[in-house]
């Protein structure tokens, strides 16, 4: 199982004066809970490494935001994170969509430095902990869940019973 997460693309305000440069923190927490399987591996197949070019507003993530997102993903139990792209392209429709390195293929971007810092930090933690192949018994014994269906949510959003309805706000 995997999901993609683009936190800063201009369509949400986040929290606080500069929240639009960090995104709404519940987006990662909800995705972790939604996609986490009872057994097996899951993670983020595409995590935004920097500015995108397809949003209504395309802000740079705040310094530290990419690293914050990575810690949030792993804190939710994910097993892996992949960045959307390694290198920012020279041309094309996503020419201004950042990668881990810039257009020259060598210069590390701010998001690339945050990936490197996170990798160093997670390696340091691995030396202080013992990996578990089996999930804890108390976790496996849980019997509570949120039943959610994207198609139902999309249908409700297109035909709201009132203009204030927000499915995600309801389940958060």
PLM region spans:
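Carbohydrate-binding surfaces of carbohydrate-active enzymes
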Residues: 3-172
């Amino acid at each position: 199982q995997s999901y993609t997460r683009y936190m800063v693309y201009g369509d949400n305000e986040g929290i606080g004066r500069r929240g639009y440069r960090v995104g709404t923190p519940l987006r990662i927490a909800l995705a972790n809970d939604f996609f986490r399987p009872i057994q097996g591996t899951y993670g983020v197949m595409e995590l935004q490494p920097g500015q995108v070019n397809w949003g209504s507003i395309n802000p740079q993530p705040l310094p530290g935001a990419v690293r914050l997102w990575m810690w949030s993903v792993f804190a939710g139990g994910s097993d892996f994170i992949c960045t959307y792209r390694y290198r920012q392209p020279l041309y094309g429709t996503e020419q201004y969509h950042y990668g881990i390195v810039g257009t020259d293929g060598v210069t590390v971007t701010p998001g690339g430095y945050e990936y490197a810092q996170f990798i160093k930090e997670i390696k340091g933690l691995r030396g202080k902990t013992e990996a578990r192949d089996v999930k804890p018994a108390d976790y496996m014994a849980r019997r509570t869940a949120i039943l959610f269906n994207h198609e139902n949510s999309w249908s409700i959003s297109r035909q709201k019973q009132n203009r204030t309805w927000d499915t995600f706000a309801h389940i958060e």
